[in-house]
Amino acid sequence: MANHKSAAKRAKQSEARRLRNKSTRSSMNTAVKKVRTAKEAGTDNATDLLNSAKSLIAKAAKKGVIHQNTAARKISRLTKSLG
């Protein structure tokens, strides 16, 4: 339990941010999985799914959920795997 008001507030803010980041990260990972399964299945919509996954990865980096370099690496490897 926090000893100060400010510590309690920070704990509350941290928890809210953690949940927000978890949601963003989860949707990003789901999009990446959809691209990989579409690639393995050989469906035509893999490039559309790739574009949406790229967008979600870039948004996660912009929000600070993941580092910019991590986002670039994920996008690069995902694009390379389809090519």
From Swiss-Prot:
Ribosomal protein found in the keyword field: yes
Query: Please, one GO biological process term?
Result: translation
Q: What is the lineage of its organism?
A: Bacteria, Pseudomonadati, Thermodesulfobacteriota, Desulfobacteria, Desulfobacterales
- Source domain of life is Bacteria
Q: One GO cellular component from the entry?
A: small ribosomal subunit
- What does the UniProt function comment say about this protein? Binds directly to 16S ribosomal RNA.
Q: Which Pfam families does the entry link to?
A: Ribosomal_S20p
- What is the name attached to this protein's record? Small ribosomal subunit protein bS20
Q: Which family does it belong to?
A: Belongs to the bacterial ribosomal protein bS20 family.
Q: Which gene encodes it?
A: rpsT
Q: Where is the composition biased (Basic residues)?
A: 1-11
Instruction: Please give the residue ranges the record annotates as the region Disordered.
Output: 1-44
Which UniProt keywords are listed? Ribonucleoprotein, Ribosomal protein, RNA-binding, rRNA-binding
Molecular function terms in GO for this entry?
Answer: small ribosomal subunit rRNA binding; structural constituent of ribosome
